[in-house]
């Protein structure tokens, strides 16, 4: 029996986005399913006591150049978001709180909004518009992201 492949990711990470696009291609081509596991990258950085590359000028410049190069090589539509980095905590919690039948569209919509369309995912109105496209009720989302079980689950995954 084959073990499932798990992909740990955060919407705030450009490398997660690029990997996500490749994963979708592989899933389609090979007819397999990858299990997406949300983490909170900001919390992980804090936990291990490192400063994210986004906050170190030389590393940030390299990351931007690297992501553009990789996206071009792999023919992935990509725009480095000038609002990088975002606080993705509520988006990651939200993924853990929605029905499994809409998780794929939720993931695709939020990744594309941030890394293709350059939208501001720190803006609640933008988030609510995307939730509507995903058929997630705003009030349910707002309630569930505050649920301690959801918070604990994300901490555990991180």
What spans do the regions from the language model cover?
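Short amphipathic alpha-helical segments at helix-loop
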Residues: 8, 48-52, 142
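Structural alpha/beta surface segment adjacent to cysteine/selenocysteine redox centers
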Residues: 17-117
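Short pre-active-site segment immediately N-terminal to redox-active cysteine/selenocysteine motifs
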Residues: 11-12
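C-terminal cap of thioredoxin/glutaredoxin-like
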Residues: 1-6, 15-33, 100-105, 109-158
